[in-house]
Design a protein with these regions (language model features):
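N-terminal "pre-motor" subdomain/linker immediately upstream of P-loop NTPase catalytic cores
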Residues: 1-119
Length: 119
């Protein structure tokens, strides 16, 4: 699952996404939020989708014992010598599960001097 999530996360960063949306019904649908709009990325069969969802819940310390309770979590993710802070929201439903990952620092670092040069 690590490699699969790394691929998804890398593609989200390349697309300048602020959020990654995962919705598991009879299949897993993944969408990226780019400039406020949801853009479809990939779909997976239900068994693979359930594994991805469980991986994300585990990484973000979401309690799997509370299946019908909305929860939040977070984790750090290292990619290409950069650490990303990810906030995770989990929303269960009667016939679906949804996870949204907010990428909190997906921009380049700007120094004070660089800010003062911006007109």
């Amino acid at each position: 699952m690590d490699e699969l999530f790394e691929t998804i996360f890398f593609k989200a960063l390349k697309a300048d996404s602020t959020d990654i949306h995962f919705k598991l019904t009879d299949h897993l649908s993944i969408q990226f939020r780019v400039f406020g709009e949801l853009q479809p990325y990939q779909e997976y069969e239900k068994t693979t989708g359930a594994k991805i969802m469980n991986y994300l819940k585990y990484k973000s310390f979401i309690n799997v014992n509370y299946k019908m309770v909305p929860q939040t979590g977070a984790f750090h993710y290292y990619l290409n010598e950069h650490i990303y802070f990810l906030r995770v929201s989990y929303l269960p439903g009667m016939d679906f599960e949804s996870i949204v990952i907010r990428i909190l620092n997906n921009h380049e670092n700007i120094t004070i001097n660089e800010i003062s040069e911006i007109d």
